[in-house]
């Protein structure tokens, strides 16, 4: 990824980061539409959610959304040197495997991320911006996959 892509990512993230919980909720609502089988993986205090809406409104899950948005923020901040996040992201991959997330679900998360960005940014979400974010997410997933695979 080159400097122009880095700037597209940073510029677009500024708009999203003003309301991370709102936009993170859009991301996860889309994820549950794409992969409803992920919903049972989210349990807090032995509570099983009856619907995506039930999950998306729970304080515990809202905290999870905040954490995910912080990880995205860290990737944006370190876009020029993602290797600095390598160990952290590998650890996230291990954690996701431990709770039953399939490696293939990372693809649906990527689709959901792009969907959220498109909804948030509207016409400023250009093909070049989409491509830059796809590259960034691909690098994040590559690091998480290493952890998921036990590397």
Curated annotation (Swiss-Prot):
Its EC number is 1.7.-.-. SUPFAM superfamilies: Globin-like. Keywords: Cytoplasm, Disulfide bond, Heme, Iron, Metal-binding, Mitochondrion, Oxidoreductase. The keyword Nucleotidyltransferase does not apply. It comes from the Eukaryota. It catalyses: Fe(III)-heme b-[protein] + nitric oxide + H2O = Fe(II)-heme b-[protein] + nitrite + 2 H(+). Phosphorylated during hypoxia by ERK1/ERK2. Phosphorylation regulates the heme pocket hexacoordination preventing the association of His-64 with the heme metal center. Thereby, promotes the access of dioxygen and nitrite to the heme and stimulates the nitrite reductase activity. Phosphorylation during hypoxia is stabilized by 14-3-3 proteins. One of its GO terms (cellular component) is mitochondrial matrix. The keyword Phosphoprotein does not apply. PROSITE patterns: GLOBIN. It is an enzyme of class 1 (oxidoreductase). Disulfide bonds: none annotated. Residues 1-149 form the Globin domain. It is found in: Cytoplasm, Cytosol; Mitochondrion matrix. Pfam families: Globin (PF00042). Heme b binds at residues 64, 96. Its main location: cytoplasm. One of its GO terms (molecular function) is metal ion binding. Monomer. Homodimer and homotetramer; disulfide-linked. Mainly monomeric but also detected as part of homodimers and homotetramers. Interacts with 14-3-3 proteins; regulates the phosphorylation of NGB. Could interact (ferrous form) with G-alpha(i) proteins (GTP-bound form). Monomeric globin with a bis-histidyl six-coordinate heme-iron atom through which it can bind dioxygen, carbon monoxide and nitric oxide. Could help transport oxygen and increase its availability to the metabolically active neuronal tissues, though its low quantity in tissues as well as its high affinity for dioxygen, which may limit its oxygen-releasing ability, argue against it. The ferrous/deoxygenated form exhibits a nitrite reductase activity and it could produce nitric oxide which in turn inhibits cellular respiration in response to hypoxia. Belongs to the globin family. This is Neuroglobin. It comes from Sus scrofa (Pig). The gene is NGB.
């Amino acid at each position: 990824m080159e400097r122009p892509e880095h700037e597209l990512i940073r510029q677009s993230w500024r708009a999203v980061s003003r309301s991370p919980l709102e936009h993170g909720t859009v991301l996860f609502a889309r994820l549950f539409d794409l992969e409803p089988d992920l919903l049972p993986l989210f349990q807090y205090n032995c509570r099983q959610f009856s619907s995506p809406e039930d999950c998306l409104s729970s304080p515990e899950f809202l905290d999870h959304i905040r954490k995910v948005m912080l990880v995205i923020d860290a990737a944006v901040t370190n876009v020029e040197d993602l290797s600095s996040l390598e160990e952290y992201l590998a650890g996230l991959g291990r954690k996701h495997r431990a709770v039953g997330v399939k490696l293939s679900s990372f693809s649906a998360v990527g689709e959901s991320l792009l969907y959220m960005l498109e909804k948030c940014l509207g016409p400023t979400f250009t093909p070049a911006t989409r491509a830059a974010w796809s590259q960034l997410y691909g690098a994040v997933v590559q690091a998480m996959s290493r952890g998921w695979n036990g590397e």
